[in-house]
Amino acid sequence: MKKTANKVVLIGAGAVGTSFLYAAINQGIAEHYVLIDAFPQPAEGNALDLSDTLAVIPHSFTSIKAGSYEDCKDADVVVITAGRPQKPGETRLEMVAGNAEIMKNIATEVKKSGFDGITVIASNPVDVITHVYQKVTGFDPHKVIGSGTTLDSARLRRLVGQKLNVKPESVQAYVAGEHGDSSVAIWSQANIMGRPILDYVKCGCLTLEDLDQIQKDTVDMAYKIINLKRATFYGIGACLTKIVNAVLRDEKATLMVGAQLNGEYKNKDLYTGVPAIIGSNGWEKIIEWDLTKEEQEKFDKSCETLHKTIDSVKHLF
């Protein structure tokens, strides 16, 4: 893909989608943006509102407009955030029926447009919804990316940094599996500037109870935010920007995205959060870590949970 004059189409011009767009515009990752939404007026309004940044933001763009699925045909990346938001107290998996139907319709229209680029999806429950999209479109699985556990991992890094009083960007810590309640913190691979996180347990700077609490707080963070302000969107918007930028710039960055497993980590036939190399061809390779027995068991259980949910929407594809 070209590094300039890239075109990004956003499907779903709500809070998550527009948070992504605002972050993307500020970082200058593309030159052309198109918004598609089931309700044309908000899409048009957001396009006009964001157009006002043209004369203000240094990393600017050439055009932004409300459009239709026909605009997907020559897009480099399609980002999908459409779907109803999570309600207070509701798990992501409980959203599956309605959002899977929405995604089937979107997938049909995107395929019909002749789109041949990379799709990045954040609609919840993202692992299942990404699976539905790939099955309905029949697109190369490598060219369909879920946001996976990028946000979960960012939350984990922030909480570890907060506990140890270090900058989150100095923390390398990862969450794998479902973007949801069954997610797994992979402590065996976590480190701070190269020093394993478990060394901090050995020296007394952290306890195993601290790690358990940090993982629990990571899982509960979305519920906390939703209870306070009814939705999460800035964090996931930033994560989507990071993924799309890695695609458009062919960065070969390793991110915790939703990629399709075909035997990796002893699981297959589903999308879930794993470390994968992201470049212009989508997720290009899954990185396989040596998980501990406990981590593998938890990961298997997370995949089993997702498979059960996928089974409930198989009639759609």
From Swiss-Prot:
The active site is at 179 (proton acceptor). One of its GO terms (molecular function) is L-lactate dehydrogenase activity. One of its GO terms (cellular component) is cytoplasm. It is found in: Cytoplasm. The gene is ldh. This is L-lactate dehydrogenase. Its EC number is 1.1.1.27. Belongs to the LDH/MDH superfamily. LDH family. Its main location: cytoplasm. It comes from the Bacteria.
